[in-house]
Amino acid sequence: MVKVLQLCFLSAISLVQALNSTVDQKDEAKVDINTVFDNDSTNFCRMDKTEAIGATCDVTFHEINEVNNNIRPQLLSLVQSDFFKYFKLDLYKECPFWSDNNGYCVNRACAVDVVEDWDSLPEYWQPEILGNIENATTDITDDECSFLDELCDKPRFEAEKDIEYCDTNDFNSQHSVLVDLTANPERFTGYGGEQSSQIWSSIYKENCFSLGDENQCLAKDAFYRLISGLHASIGTHLSNEHLNTETGKWEPNLELFMTRVGNFPDRVSNIYFNFAVVAKALWKIRPYMNELGFCNAYNEDVKGMIDGVVSQLNSKVFNEDLLFHDEVSGQLKDDFRIRFKNVTKIMDCVQCDRCRLWGKVQTTGYATSLKILFEMDNDDDVARQHVVDKLTKYELIALFNTFDRLSKSVEAVNRFEEMYNYQLKSPGEKLASFFQLDNFFKVLNDKFNSANHSSQEKESVSNVEKKVNEFNDLKMPEKKKETHTEVREQASGVFKEAWDVEWKNFKQALRFIVTSYTDLPSTVSKYTVLKLNKLWNKFIGVPNYLEEGEELEYPSYNYEE
């Protein structure tokens, strides 16, 4: 095995040296780096940024980038304010779809720090006033006069239909806890594997609608793009906040981003699509913001930041009227609502607490957006106000935090694009990133270094600092012949040591078998005498012989040795 690794490593060295010599000889021949790395294998943002995002959007990628650059500072300050940085959820709610509890994340990065010092919170976050704050029309009182006044002055909404796209009862659960989102940032936790794949597989399977009408294509496409955009946005966040094990810092990881998002233009496009959806919801609810009861808790600075963000949005970013516009589409809208509600419930199956937290925040934010877009489609202002009155403070908090997450994703996508283009402009950097991405040469180098570790300690290495295009991660032995000989000798020593261990184990096993056979006659004879003695005493009339006399001592064996 060592020889195989050695040969593979030597082949890798030859390839690297050949590539380096080709790049360094600029006067003799120039290499077009795109011939080594075909552009078809790297699909980062291969789209026309001047085109519209989709059939339901009248906005381009470039326009969203400009809007995001303008609102990003105020939006970041807004979600870090006292009102918008807290969220309430049940971290221990059981999964309603399956009972697989084998995927718990025991990593510290998966944990969530909940709020315990309530005295440090503002007044509107104290326990006695937490919960839904609704309009007076929804308050239930025992005062008959108040009830009659309400009937006379306010419209009645009989047979009220379900307009919820998420389970709002979770906010009032006795098991729910308050969490500071700024103290629990969304970042890479190491959670994944089969359990994570099961979560996303179940979410994507919700895109199976019962109706077969051709008009549902736009709705199905919108549903899929929402889920895909959510998935891609989360992947972007985790790639942007990835732990560098060498420096111990959280920093962008271009390779991880390209693997999850960058090599798939449709995923990048769906992030922008989700940005447009949530932006349209914020634009649509703007006229009613001051009429929300809990909005009185804002200070003037927060109100100014909200207006500063929402005022830069417009209605053309998303046209929800194209999705549901007739009776058949009304049934499709109910199916759409139920299925997205299931998506929010699937987040209760996530076994990583921090992943569940941000999954709940973002799915609740999307659910709130859909409720605003699809349920406020009536021209009646009173009916619109009724929908607004059904909003809770946690839905509004989730809405703005989800918009912040999408804004962060758009910002990160542009940063990753700059990093990607920077590597393309430098041939040495591009070659180095290629080998680091595959990690093949790094594995070979680690195997080779572990085999000749003792020989490398004896060698003195000069010229420690080299250029990046000289492949610093490949440690070239200076004396190949001597190093190969020493490696061969050490490999022989390792083989001899392994042989000695196996031979010792074989002798011990053989000794055990032989001893068992040699002791068999003695063991059988003792057992026979014991049985005959018991039968004889029973024959001569000694009752309960073994119980009345001393107990016989059986030979003891230590099975743990």
Curated annotation (Swiss-Prot):
GO (cellular component) term, any one: endoplasmic reticulum membrane
GO molecular function, one term: thiol oxidase activity
Keyword Endoplasmic reticulum tagged: yes
Pfam families: ERO1
Chain sites annotated for binding FAD: R187, T189, W200, S228, H231, R260
Presence of keyword RNA-binding: no
Enzyme Commission identifier(s): 1.8.4.-
InterPro entries, per the entry: Ero1, ERO1-like_sf
Disulfide bridge partners, by residue number: C95-C349, C105-C110, C145-C166, C152-C295, C352-C355
Enzyme class: oxidoreductase
Subunit structure: May function both as a monomer and a homodimer.
Family from the record: Belongs to the EROs family.
Functional note: Essential oxidoreductase that oxidizes proteins in the endoplasmic reticulum to produce disulfide bonds. Acts by oxidizing directly PDI1 isomerase through a direct disulfide exchange. Does not act as a direct oxidant of folding substrate, but relies on PDI1 to transfer oxidizing equivalent. Does not oxidize all pdi related proteins, suggesting that it can discriminate between PDI1 and related proteins. Its reoxidation probably involves electron transfer to molecular oxygen via FAD. Acts independently of glutathione.
Name of the protein this chain belongs to: Endoplasmic reticulum oxidoreductin-1
